[in-house]
Amino acid sequence: MAGKTLYDKLWDDHVVTQRDDGSCLLYIDRHLLHEVTSPQAFEGLQLAGRQPWRLSANVATPDHNVPTSKKERDQGIAGIEDDTSRIQVQTLDDNCKAFNIVEFGINDIRQGIVHVVGPEQGLTLPGMTVVCGDSHTATHGAFGCLAHGIGTSEVEHVLATQCLVQKKSKNMLVRVDGVLGKGVTPKDVVLAIIGKIGTAGGTGYAIEFGGQVFRDMSIEGRMTVCNMAIEAGARVGMVAVDEKTIEYVKGRSYAPKGEQWDQAVAYWNTLHSDDDAVFDAVVELNGTEIEPQVSWGTSPEMVIPVSKAVPTLEQAKDDVQRNDWTRAYQYMGLNAGQALADIQLDRVFIGSCTNSRIEDIRAAAEVVKGRKVAPSIKQAMIVPGSGLVKQQAEKEGLDKIFLEAGFEWREPGCSMCLAMNADKLQPGEHCASTSNRNFEGRQGNGGRTHLVSPAMAAAAAIAGHFVDVRSF
């Protein structure tokens, strides 16, 4: 009998019952909530007269709609100018109080982007099933978790039953061996993967990321990669547990202590695919060949190394891709064969659940130190992923590096990743962004998004256009 993959092990450990149609009822260990996908779920509980099944499994924080300017933030919820955004944040606050759910509120130092806060607090632990009403919940798979996003009706179901009906995915292994070169980051790795397999390449699969590159990668780097599994078409992305995982979790607020810690570690050390496990699909990349990446179009798969030019229609593989590229040229205001360095940038955004952790901010600061934002850049902003990340960065003096260079140093939140708060692009503006999505209008109506790493974004802010960070 063949061995099990990590995904198989996590799935089997959480099956409550198998249904006649082949789907399974899974037990959910951790449920993270935010203000956008939870209001109707809480209303459903109220109308049915139900209470959350296991209060301690649920933790909430507002992130999508919160303002990141200090002036607005100091006013708390009342400082949110947009009525809909303010109502959503207030409703989360009210619901958490009504149901006695722990919430890291808008002015709590622990508040932040839910996918930064969960691991930071030790709410995310190896071996857990983790769900949240947000597609980038795959982030938590970096800890050897089975983590994925859910819809609002499923949020209600988890609140009420602590279980969820799911159909099992197939197994895919993405193996990246070799050693990353100078200036090549986890963000470049995942963009290169998406560039290779496309945004539908992982559809129907749970992706395990393996190989030397991921073994060498930090936990925060693994979070960046797993975060974008959804952009590769998969709901689930994960990395096996190792000593780095255990060391990261140790001592965090919600991590087990004493004898419970020892028992947990013994289990966590089993969370890897068996040597004889069989995957349904295997994708391989040579990490040594990966360069810093820049997305040029309106899909994460429209990505190229910084050394390349915008592709021409002759390079498209079929008519569908030719049509997609033609529309992307028009929307992005680019020409086939245009050099990336010729794209005039308007704004730079360093933040989001993909790249707003302390390592990301350090990487950007290393590039920025002693330099100035180019006069042609209208706005360059750093948005830490949580209050604690912001606090740590300020302790290290990183905020001063950015402020002296001409960056804005913001309060934590989702910010310019998506057009649901005050941080938006104007029509026609090009933005070097460390976020995860670049479809039409993602950062604001008519806004043009280019996905890059924090180091590449920082270099672009200084140069005023894309430049190979390896030359800095």
Swiss-Prot record:
Highest taxon, organism lineage: Bacteria
CDD domains in UniProt: IPMI
Keyword Iron-sulfur assigned: yes
GO molecular function: 3-isopropylmalate dehydratase activity; 4 iron, 4 sulfur cluster binding; metal ion binding
Class in the EC hierarchy, top level: lyase
GO terms (BP aspect): L-leucine biosynthetic process
Catalytic activity, as annotated: (2R,3S)-3-isopropylmalate = (2S)-2-isopropylmalate
Cofactor binding notes: Binds 1 [4Fe-4S] cluster per subunit.
Residues holding [4Fe-4S] cluster: 353, 414, 417
Pathway: Amino-acid biosynthesis; L-leucine biosynthesis; L-leucine from 3-methyl-2-oxobutanoate: step 2/4
Pfam families, per the entry: Aconitase
The protein's required cofactors: [4Fe-4S] cluster
Known EC number: 4.2.1.33
HAMAP family recorded: LeuC_type1 (MF_01026)
Reported function: Catalyzes the isomerization between 2-isopropylmalate and 3-isopropylmalate, via the formation of 2-isopropylmaleate.
Subunit structure: Heterodimer of LeuC and LeuD.
Family: Belongs to the aconitase/IPM isomerase family. LeuC type 1 subfamily.
Protein name: 3-isopropylmalate dehydratase large subunit
Species this protein is from: Acinetobacter baumannii (strain ATCC 17978 / DSM 105126 / CIP 53.77 / LMG 1025 / NCDC KC755 / 5377)
